[in-house]
Amino acid sequence: MFVPKKSKYKKVFKGRIKGNAKGGSTLSFGDYGLKAMEVGKVQSKHIETARRVISRTLKRSGKVWIRIFPDTPVSKKPADVRMGKGKGSIEFWVFKAKPGRVLFEISSDVPMHLARLALEKATAKLPMKCKFISNHN
C-alpha cells in the first residue's frame, strides 16, 4: 500500500476538487497511458489493485509507471460513536484526481492491443471514468 513517510499536517480538511489537471496531463515515460476523465479520489488500495491487474495482464513484460501518489489523509470516526470529541483517526490515504491527469503509463515494449486490454481492466478497478491514450495517434 502507498502511504507517505511524513506529512506536514496529520489531518486535513475535505475540500473540493474543481477544474482540470494543471500538470501531468501528457505521457512522459511510456507510449501508452490511462487518463482520468472525471474527478475522483483514488485510494492507495485502488492504485495497488490496478497495478496488479496491469502487471498480470502484461505477464510482467514491459514497464509500468504509476504517475500518482496518495498524499491526502482521510479520517473516519469509528462505528457507534456519538458526535463530537474531535476529528476521527486516519483511515486511508487518497490522491485527488482531476480530469486530464495521467494515472498509469506502459512502455512501448508491449503490443498496443495488450496495453489497451491491461489498462481497460485497470479502469474497472478505479473509482472514475478513464480513457486509454497513446503516442501513436
Swiss-Prot record:
Q: Which InterPro entries match?
A: Ribosomal_uL16 (IPR047873), Ribosomal_uL16_bact-type (IPR000114), Ribosomal_uL16_CS (IPR020798), Ribosomal_uL16_dom (IPR016180), Ribosomal_uL16_sf (IPR036920)
Keywords attached to this entry: Ribonucleoprotein, Ribosomal protein, RNA-binding, rRNA-binding, tRNA-binding
The organism's superkingdom is given as Bacteria
The cysteines covalently paired via disulfide bonds are none
Name the job this protein performs: Binds 23S rRNA and is also seen to make contacts with the A and possibly P site tRNAs.
Question: What subunit structure does UniProt give?
Answer: Part of the 50S ribosomal subunit.
What this protein is called in its record is: Large ribosomal subunit protein uL16
Q: Which organism is it from?
A: Wolbachia pipientis subsp. Culex pipiens (strain wPip)
